[in-house]
């Protein structure tokens, strides 16, 4: 009996190999219990085999055979019974173990079976990855009262550490307290595991600190426990395509090689009947077809080489696509990188797909229009999957130009050009580059650039709406439908286009705040609409500025001996009833060429025409236009009288030693720039804003003064106090220009007051 039993045990071990040792307590307990059940089953089947042997012995006794297992001799009333040599093996295997085998097959697809395979896979991955500090944990959907959520509590995990630090263990404990949405429409947080589970696509980042809090709710714990790179993979059951769990891998250092390691990870998982996304994770090289021929790539590469060299561009990425796909992949052979950082970013581009609408390249591909962004590094990872790499390698402003085929005018390539880091005027530079590309592609027999386009600015889209609940109870809206967010942006753009110049003129008499309220938009949107129509300053503010300048001018004139009462400039503003009317079709402005001279102190003597000491001033303003509408010259009786005087009666221009008055169009301190007072929490500092400074320069200086690290720099926001005593958000260079102009042209102090806000800091409201 020992021989058959050994054969049975050996066959069972070959068919169902025991789980390898693991440090996972839940898995070890389940495995121990199952092994106990198997041993008891062995004993039961052994007793059954003994019972069968005893029965055969009884048969032998009655039939009189010397060997119960040998063929029986023929008799008149008996039949020959032949027991083969492997009779006992067949008996025990086919009948005794059939039910156990069926139960084990069912266990492979059960949660406990998944845990065992994942536990074995985790141990194997720790050896394959070779990371000195690595946490692998499993997120499994569970049913709760609030719905189906992803949880890692009481699920397998593995920690590999060679240091005394307990940071990964503490981060594991913190993660166990979180649950994420496992179905669309859930009120739970989405987070990284939720996005991977719902999208069924892997996601990774070189540094989790680049995430926003709404994208990665555990960002606070990640910073505290020095967590850096992370990779999350969806796990599928066999070939069914159903996502059954999410495996998350976390390290304490930055990792730029996850994409290259994905192939190894996938093979390691397949050894345990675990599979990840069926979609290609790393973009495969595009097939050379009619839509993406090698000759076209060579032509594009040559043009990019010339453009980047002549304009000093650090990077230019060529994106291509398959004929039947809207997914963009980087074409390395047709791209250009000038330095090491650009080459690293280009390598990251080769490891990512861009779907329609993602980044400015995806937006240009979807709309067939040129797009530019002042800073792609501040985009969310949902809006631009490469935003974290842009932060790492200091890439900001970029322009995307779709390259069309001459025949059917379909998009064949998208060129993404990154501007130099010291480029100030992004929009002008975009127009120049687009014009140069158009000229260079004119000689191409197959490719072209649309010559009837003006690049539109793309800002970071809000994270797509899918209702979530913040840990503090605040509702946050998210969605995994990029089409809905794109539709909202289109609707908003259409509403802005409906506001014409005539509509704006009807509200010129009031303040900007009242006009925005009456039109039905926010003040920031109204300012943007005004800039699109050529209005750099809301007229009522400009009139107040001119009136204030005239009053200051009157004070200077009155201080000059002999000119008191000769000309009252302070009454100009009150003398224009048209300024208070909103029904006027044209709005009066001061003519930029109109000049007011101060009359001499006394009539010229008979001995000659001698100029006396006086003051000569000129009231002029920068020429303004409203969308091509030229503002009419000022028609006022006093000015007409001055212009119609006889040449001998006209005021004489005199010189003065008084310092010139500050002009509204020049900075008060051209050398030192504007003074800035920045407040961050309970801290405050003063600094100078140099002329022509960009918002990125201001953010960088503020972050440096307050001692912020790279992650904090990318997450804080700035607001300035405007002339309506409201905090207005600074999001781009145009907002910064608006801020400077408000302080220059209003009665505010010369020091710009800026509020620095960070999601993890307590709000500060300066007085």
From Swiss-Prot:
Compositional bias of kind Low complexity: 604-622, 655-667
List the InterPro entries hit by this protein, alphabetically.
NLP (IPR045012), NLP1-9_GAF (IPR055081), PB1-like (IPR053793), PB1_dom (IPR000270), PB1_NLP (IPR034891), RWP-RK_dom (IPR003035)
Any single GO molecular-function term of the entry would be: DNA binding
Q: Where is the PB1 domain?
A: 673-759
List the residue ranges forming a coiled coil, or say none.
Answer: 485-506
Major localization listed first in the record, in broad terms: nucleus
Subcellular location, record wording: Nucleus
**CDD domains xrefs:** PB1_NLP (cd06407)
Induction section of the entry? Up-regulated by nitrate.
GO annotations of cellular component type: nucleus
What SMART domains does this protein map onto?
PB1 (SM00666)
One biological process GO term for this chain? regulation of DNA-templated transcription
Entry keywords, A to Z: Coiled coil, DNA-binding, Nucleus, Transcription, Transcription regulation
Q: Which residues form the RWP-RK domain?
A: 482-566
For the region Disordered, give the residue spans: 462-494, 590-622, 646-672
Pfam families linked to this entry: GAF_NLP (PF22922), PB1 (PF00564), RWP-RK (PF02042)
Task: Relate the protein's function as given in its record.
Answer: Probable transcription factor.
The protein in question is named Protein NLP3
